[in-house]
C-alpha cells in the first residue's frame, strides 16, 4: 500500500512539472513578474513583431522582416500577399486592430524556444483571437501564428 501511495505521489509530482503538447516538452507558463531580463527583451521584440503584422490590417503597409528579426522560414511565409489575405478576413470579421495584450510566456524545452501568447484586441467585442510569437535562442521570431482564443495553452 505504501509503495502504491508513493508511486502515485511521484507520478503526480512529475506530471505537474512539464506537459507534452504535440510531442514537445512544455514547461509551466511564466508570468510577467517571473521573467528574466532576457525574457523581457524577447517579450518586447515579440510584441513589436506581432503588432507590426496585425497593424498591417489597418494601414495596408507591411515592412518585411529582416534576417536579424526572424528566421528564413518566417521571412518566406510572411509575404505581403499572405498577410493581405489574412488582414482582409480579419478586418471584415473583427474590425480594426487595436492592440496586443500580453498573457503568458511558455518555455518550450524541446527546441529551446519561448512561446509568447498575446490576446489580440479588435474593434468588435466578439473578436477573440490569440497571437503566438515563438522566439528562438538567437532572439529571432521562428513562428508567428493566430488561433482562436482559449484560456489554457494547448
Predicted regions located by residue number:
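Exposed beta-sheet edge and beta->alpha loop/turn motif
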Residues: 108-154
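Mature soluble domains of exported/periplasmic/lumenal proteins and thiol-rich metal-chelating peptides
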Residues: 60, 81, 86, 144, ...
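Positively charged n-region of N-terminal signal peptides that target proteins for export
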Residues: 1-4
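Short, low-complexity N-terminal intrinsically disordered segments enriched in polar/charged residues
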Residues: 18-56
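Short solvent-exposed beta->alpha transition segments
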Residues: 64-111
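Sec-dependent N-terminal signal peptides
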Residues: 7-8
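Short helix-adjacent coil turns
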Residues: 57-65
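C-terminal motif of bacterial Sec signal peptides marking the signal peptidase cleavage site
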Residues: 14-15
Amino acid at each position: 500500500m505504501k509503495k502504491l501511495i508513493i508511486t502515485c505521489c511521484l507520478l503526480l509530482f512529475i506530471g505537474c512539472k512539464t506537459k507534452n503538447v504535440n510531442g514537445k516538452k512544455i514547461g509551466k507558463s511564466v508570468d510577467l513578474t517571473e521573467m528574466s531580463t532576457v525574457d523581457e527583451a524577447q517579450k518586447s521584440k515579440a510584441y513589436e513583431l506581432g503588432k507590426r503584422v496585425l497593424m498591417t490590417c489597418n494601414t495596408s503597409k507591411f515592412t518585411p522582416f529582416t534576417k536579424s528579426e526572424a528566421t528564413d522560414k518566417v521571412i518566406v511565409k510572411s509575404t505581403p500577399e499572405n498577410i493581405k489575405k489574412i488582414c482582409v478576413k480579419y478586418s471584415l470579421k473583427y474590425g480594426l486592430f487595436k492592440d496586443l495584450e500580453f498573457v503568458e510566456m511558455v518555455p518550450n524545452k524541446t527546441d529551446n524556444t519561448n512561446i509568447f501568447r498575446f490576446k489580440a484586441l479588435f474593434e468588435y467585442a466578439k473578436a477573440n483571437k490569440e497571437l503566438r510569437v515563438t522566439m528562438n535562442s538567437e532572439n529571432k521570431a521562428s513562428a508567428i501564428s493566430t488561433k482562436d482564443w482559449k484560456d489554457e495553452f494547448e
